[in-house]
Regions:
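Serine-esterase "nucleophile elbow" of acetyl-processing enzymes
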Residues: 1-52, 65-68
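Alpha-helical cap/lid subdomain in secreted, periplasmic
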Residues: 32-45, 54, 60-206
Length: 206
């Protein structure tokens, strides 16, 4: 696999994930601080790649598609895996996630990866036992968080959403409401800010 060196100019922040990212972008477009999540456009470029229904393998394929178009991220935010719960054995899912994160790091040795943990759902569509899936979600999050931190990545916990208040969700019990999405975007912004602090010694603020 080729390594792609960073080009000059703005720090490129990419957000890749399933419908949560798709809906988060749509919400950010109509609510302050906007699609840039409050970061200065002159120094940071925030790019959203949300694909509804995306399962974990889509992270790698989406990344490759964008890279082949001549672009590359400096900071990569990933929110995916939730649509695989109940369909892929936990061990297999964790292995696939770790392997892909390693591939990404080989492609971009200087990248900062931000792992956005899977948030709870009131309804798990592919599960006979929702509580069992919730326990598995917690285990996967814990394992991936530890893995990402080993290579100085950033973990976004979404602690407020762990309260699972009905008002945080859309009527389907899967997707987040406007309130829930605002909280989701706030946490993503905080995670990106931490990643920027590790990038170029925080020179983006200068």
């Amino acid at each position: 696999m080729f390594c792609f060196p960073r080009t000059g100019g703005r720090i490129a922040v990419w957000l890749i994930g399933h419908s949560f990212i798709h809906r988060a972008r749509r919400r950010a477009a109509v609510k302050k601080p906007g699609l840039q999540l409050g970061f200065p456009e002159g120094k940071v470029g925030v790019h959203w790649f949300g694909v509804r229904g995306m399962r974990w393998p889509g992270v790698w394929s989406t990344l490759l598609q964008k890279v082949k178009a001549g672009r590359r991220p400096d900071i990569l935010v990933i929110h995916a895996g939730g649509n695989d719960m109940g369909l892929v054995p936990q061990k297999d899912l964790v292995t696939a996630m770790k392997n892909d994160l390693d591939r990404i790091r080989r492609m971009f040795p200087d990248i900062v990866i931000v792992w956005s943990e899977m948030v709870p759902r009131l309804v798990w569509r592919h599960a006979r036992d929702g509580q069992r899936i919730e326990r598995s979600r917690g285990k996967v999050n814990k394992l991936l968080a530890a893995f990402v931190r080993k290579f100085n990545g950033v973990v976004v916990r979404h602690k407020v959403l762990e309260e699972k208040l009905p008002g945080y969700y859309w009527k389907d019990g899967v997707h987040l409401s406007d309130v829930g999405t605002d909280l989701f975007n706030l946490a993503l912004g905080e995670g990106i800010e931490r990643a920027l602090g590790r990038f170029d010694g925080g020179s983006w603020q200068a």
